Amino acid sequence: MPRKVDHRARRELLADALLRLAATRGLEEVSLRHVAAEAGVSTGMVQHYFRTKDEMMTFALDMVMDRIRARSQAAMTSTVPRELVRSLLLQVLPLDETRRQENHVVLAYFAYAAVRPAIASGLREAAAQTRRFLADQLRAAGAFDLDPERAAAGLLALVDGLGLQLLSRQLAEEEAVAALDAQL
């Protein structure tokens, strides 16, 4: 009797191996062979689930974004717009090991996106969705004298910068959270 294989789980296993490589050694170290070694499987298995490196890279990025989205939605328990915005932005900052790894990976993907239009498109769409959500919450909060779209873009830029400061250990976590709170 043939074994039933969960193809999604196998693809996620391989994507997790890719993400570990990206977080520790950078995306330039990602290859089908390196991912296979990291996952403890054959290169043939990787090729079975992903035809190309770009297909694997896109899947892994989508998986990271889905995880960030799911964690952010779970953390947004308030109905107060300002608290919703704060909850979302705190989930993006590298304040624990999981988020540090995700930030390392997303940062590597930004560099990769400079030469890969498909990756750039995925990052652009994720940022646009986040900006729309933030702008909607700012509108709901009735923020005076603010253009919600510009304010949302500014908050995302702030969090990106704070993330870099945290990753490079130029700011302590408490300082980054205080800087974010000062802008809210």
For each feature predicted by the language model, list its residue ranges:
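Hydrophobic alpha-helical connector segments
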Residues: 59, 73-102, 148-155
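Residues in soluble alpha-helical coiled-coils and helical-bundle/repeat scaffolds
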Residues: 51-55, 76, 80, 97-101, ...
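N-terminal intrinsically disordered/low-complexity leader segments
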Residues: 1-9
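Short, basic, alpha-helical segments at the C-terminal edge of helix-turn-helix-like DNA-binding modules
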Residues: 62-68
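Amphipathic C-terminal alpha-helical segment
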Residues: 95, 108, 112-115, 155-174
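Amphipathic alpha-helical packing segments from all-alpha helical-bundle domains
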Residues: 69, 98-107, 117-142, 153
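C-terminal peripheral helix-coil segments that are non-catalytic and often amphipathic
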Residues: 1, 131-139, 154, 158, ...
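Helix-turn-helix
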Residues: 13, 17-55, 59
